[in-house]
Curated annotation (Swiss-Prot):
<dbReference type="GO" id="GO:0000287">
    <property type="term" value="F:magnesium ion binding"/>
</dbReference>
<keyword id="KW-0820">tRNA-binding</keyword>
<dbReference type="GO" id="GO:0016740">
    <property type="term" value="F:transferase activity"/>
</dbReference>
<dbReference type="GO" id="GO:0000049">
    <property type="term" value="F:tRNA binding"/>
</dbReference>
<feature type="binding site">
    <location>
        <position position="471"/>
    </location>
    <ligand>
        <name>Mg(2+)</name>
    </ligand>
</feature>
<dbReference type="InterPro" id="IPR045060">
    <property type="entry name" value="Phe-tRNA-ligase_IIc_bsu"/>
</dbReference>
<dbReference type="InterPro" id="IPR033714">
    <property type="entry name" value="tRNA_bind_bactPheRS"/>
</dbReference>
<comment type="similarity">
    <text>Belongs to the phenylalanyl-tRNA synthetase beta subunit family. Type 1 subfamily.</text>
</comment>
<dbReference type="InterPro" id="IPR005146">
    <property type="entry name" value="B3/B4_tRNA-bd"/>
</dbReference>
<protein>
    <recommendedName>
        <fullName>Phenylalanine--tRNA ligase beta subunit</fullName>
        <ecNumber>6.1.1.20</ecNumber>
    </recommendedName>
</protein>
<keyword id="KW-0030">Aminoacyl-tRNA synthetase</keyword>
<dbReference type="Pfam" id="PF03484">
    <property type="entry name" value="B5"/>
</dbReference>
<feature type="domain" description="B5">
    <location>
        <begin position="409"/>
        <end position="484"/>
    </location>
</feature>
<keyword id="KW-0479">Metal-binding</keyword>
<keyword id="KW-0436">Ligase</keyword>
<dbReference type="GO" id="GO:0005524">
    <property type="term" value="F:ATP binding"/>
</dbReference>
<comment type="subunit">
    <text>Tetramer of two alpha and two beta subunits.</text>
</comment>
């Protein structure tokens, strides 16, 4: 943000303070001044001259011989090559002895035999960048208004005796992206008042509502749209003081109407747009989403293709502007414009950013909407622009403002106490001092018991909590005035939060189950970013990644775990069992910050039992990994709320995959990596799982209830069932548990067979059922009765029969 010292003086009494001193005060109050540019530094001897006569140079076709009054005793002759120099003009003259940028000194000279006593200057020759010079003066000299005083200082008239402060604003201080915002900040620092601009003007008798209506179709993207009608305007150059302010702020002047909208943008921070009413093409403004592939030619004469994500301002049929980004060329203000439709609106910053990014079109307006504007200034800015158009374009402002308003500005009341401020800052600050500080900032302060109730104006969107108010108090009190003391805090006993304790329990269980912890990169490539994700998410892409392989924040832990499995297998580690507890990053809407949430994932391959003393060698299969997951869920006391549901996922084996539901909500998955992906990664049969750790640890759990160890012996019955391949073991297990009644204590799957001697489309699933009666010894009749119910239920439900 470039801040003109002289422009700032319009709003705040700076009492002649040196710009460097002011910059130091602003920096010490928390907004860094990155530099000061002294306009016109090193330039001297430039005055306003009056061209009395102009004639063709006798010896050069492209030179002019001019007689110029520079306020001296007699006019001087100056040879000028500018094509636009003419008799009667007021121009900038570098007199003999003057110094221009680059230490260029002006001397008497003879040009093609004619004496020249000075130089008539263009703005570029006075140090102004070409891109900031109005088009009419881009190839020639600058012409002052006729009322400019001959012989007076040209630098002062062009405000080249100004100092420009460059503010390094952090993203939260969007309020300081305009002159009034900076004025409020400086006034608070200097403990003075802000002089607000006047917005009074005489309204015409005609009503604006007779000329235009407003309709908003997307109230979320555009909660407020206002329109004013201004008739009988005369398009001309804007006043010199306005042009110079715009140039010092880095904006090229165009004409009075366009310059006024840009001036108010810089003054209030509120983007405006002026349409040529007659070229707009209708008496209604309709704000809607663009049609897919709808076209518009913007003010930069570029034809742009829009999408349904973009918001447009239309005349009911055709787009006339991309909302918050740039107007359309069709209704552009031109030299013959007579009636203005003035727009002031509040557009959703995320929607504007999306359109700006998609179209590759970044403007002063889009930047401010993206960072957040003050909703309370929308109408004020429109009134200010209407006043200036009345004054400098002769416009008649029709009575009333036509608008559609769905914008609610809620009071931002925050409670804070002097004791809390004193405690945090390590000093003693009274309630009265605190009230004074907040009032200097333009806040309203009330009291409730021992607390201050501070109402923060809507322009300060960065202040939302008590700690923000404490920071404001520190800024205005002065960081240099805070004594160096040790913090005064009560002693606290170290310990883990409940979440941390549960997370540690997860790690301990998985390590106890035989898995080793892995830590992998949070960044991955586009292909892997969305693979294995529990839920869909948009990608969060780094602006300047070190490489394409590490350019996107991950959605799942599994892809990088599989890379680790592949790495270990390639180095002769036959069996790998890894887990990771880490963050994934999910984005629901484009251009919003990703949500960081924790997941736990595992990848297991090879032999689960590989040593002789562990028994017969056993390869990893679905049920081994499912047992690990069930053990973890049981450890967290949520297993009773869990359901495994057969599913299909692109990267997993279609017949060996299950979603994991907690109280009916998806929290993870388990399955074998798809054979094609295993081949691509050059890994053996590998099983993976991933769980939403945050959802698991936040789940409500039933209190643990002590159950005595049974005094009486249990009876175990093993069964092998032949059933359709489409029936999962989980479905069979559910039927067994429901039919087994209170005597059935435990059900365990111990074998699945689909090989030789099985019918086509059939498989064998073997279960071990444990029956026990906690009150007495089971009889054979009781076991047989309960077991028969189980077998009948299996046959009735899934046509599952005992294997012969």
């Amino acid at each position: 943000m470039f801040v003109s010292y002289k422009w700032l003086e319009d709003y705040v009494d700076l009492k002649g303070m040196d710009p460097a001193v002011l910059a130091e005060k602003i920096t010490r109050a928390g907004i860094e001044v990155e530099g000061i540019e002294y306009k016109g530094e090193g330039i001297k001897g430039v005055v306003i001259g009056h061209v009395l006569e102009r004639e063709q140079h006798p010896n050069a076709d492209k030179l002019n011989k001019c007689l110029v009054d520079i306020g001296a005793e007699a006019p001087v002759q100056i040879i000028c090559g500018a094509p636009n120099v003419d008799k009667g003009q007021k121009v900038a003259v570098a007199t003999v002895g003057a110094v221009l940028p680059g230490n260029f000194k002006i001397k008497k000279a003879k040009l093609r035999g004619e004496e020249s006593n000075g130089m008539i200057c263009s703005l570029q020759e006075l140090g102004i960048e070409s891109k900031l010079v109005a088009k009419e003066y881009a190839e020639g000299i600058f012409v002052f208004p006729n009322d400019a005083e001959t012989g007076s200082d040209a630098l002062a008239a062009l405000q080249l005796d100004d100092a420009i402060l460059e503010l390094g604003l952090t993203p939260n201080r969007a309020d300081a992206m305009n002159m009034l915002g900076v004025a409020y900040e400086v006034a608070a620092i200097l403990d003075t008042e802000v002089k607000l601009p006047q917005t009074d003007y005489p309204a015409a008798s005609e009503q604006a509502s007779d000329y235009i209506s407003v309709k908003i179709e997307d109230q979320e993207a555009n909660p407020l749209y206002t329109a004013k009608i201004i008739k009988n305007v005369t398009i001309a150059p804007s006043p010199l003081w306005m042009q110079t302010k715009l140039m010092n702020a880095g904006i090229r002047p165009h004409n009075n109407v366009v310059d006024i909208t840009n001036f108010v943008l810089l003054e209030y921070g509120q983007p405006l747009h002026a349409f040529d009413y007659d070229r707009f093409g209708s008496k209604e403004v309709v704000v809607r989403k663009a049609a897919e592939n709808e076209m518009i030619v913007t003010l930069d004469d570029q034809e742009r293709k829009l999408s349904a994500d973009h918001l447009v301002i239309t005349n009911g049929t055709k787009a006339q502007a991309v909302a918050g980004v740039m107007g359309g060329a069709e209704s552009e203000v031109q030299e013959d414009t007579k009636t203005i439709l003035l727009e002031a609106a509040y557009f959703n910053g995320q929607k504007v950013r999306k359109a700006s990014k998609d179209l590759g079109l970044r403007s002063e307006s889009s930047v401010r909407f993206e960072k957040g504007i003050d909703p309370a200034r929308v109408r004020l800015a429109a009134e200010r622009a209407a006043q200036l158009i009345h004054l400098y374009a002769g416009g008649e402002v029709l009575a009333g403002t036509v608008e559609e308003d769905h914008l609610t500005i809620e009071a931002n009341n925050i409670h804070v106490s002097a004791d809390k401020v004193s405690s945090v800052l390590g000093l003693t600050i009274s309630k009265e001092e605190l009230i004074s500080i907040y009032k200097r900032l333009g806040f309203t302060v009330g009291e409730a018991d021992d607390l201050l109730v501070v109402t923060v104006p809507s322009r300060r969107g960065d202040i939302t909590i008590e700690e923000d108010l404490i920071e404001e108090a520190a800024r205005l009190y002065g960081y240099d005035n805070i004594p160096s003391t040790l913090p005064e805090t009560a002693g606290t006993t170290g310990g883990l939060t409940p979440y941390q304790a549960k997370r540690r329990k997860v790690r301990r269980f998985l390590e106890g189950a035989g898995l080793s912890q892995a830590i992998t990169y949070s960044l991955t490539n586009e292909k892997k970013a969305t693979a294995f994700a529990i839920e869909k998410s948009l990608n969060t892409v780094l602006a300047l990644p070190m490489s394409e392989e590490r350019s996107i924040l991950r959605h799942s832990l599994v892809p990088n775990l599989l890379d680790s499995v592949s790495y270990n297998l390639a180095r002769q580690t036959d069996s790998v069992a890894l887990y990771e507890v880490g963050s994934v990053f999910l984005t629901k809407e484009e251009d919003t910050k990703p949500v960081e949430t924790e997941r736990v994932a595992g990848a297991v391959t090879g032999l689960w039992r590989k040593q002789l003393w562990q028994g017969e060698k056993k390869p990893v299969d679905f049920f081994v990994v499912k047992g690990i997951v069930e053990g973890l869920l049981d450890k967290l006391n949520v297993l009773d709320s869990i359901e495994f549901v057969q599913s299909e996922r692109k990267q997993l084996h279609p017949g060996r995959t299950a979603n994991i539901l907690l109280n009916g909500s998806l929290i993870g998955f388990i399955g074998q990596v798809h054979p094609s992906l295993e081949k691509e990664l050059d890994i053996k049969e590998t099983y993976v799982f991933e769980l939403d750790l945050h959802a698991l640890l936040a789940a409500e759990t039933a209190p643990l209830v002590y159950t005595a160890i049974p005094k009486y012996p249990s009876v175990t019955r093993d069964i092998a069932l032949v059933t359709d391949k489409t029936v999962t073991s989980g479905q069979l297990e559910s039927v067994i548990k429901e039919a087994g009644g209170k005597l059935l204590k435990e059900v365990t799957v111990f074998d699945v067979y689909e090989g030789e001697h099985m019918e086509e489309g059939k498989k064998s699933v073997a279960f071990s059922l444990q029956y026990v009666n906690p009150e007495q010894t089971l009889t054979e009749e009781e076991v047989t009765k309960a077991h028969s119910k189980v077998l009948k239920a299996l046959e009735d439900t899934y046509q599952a029969v005992l294997r012969g």
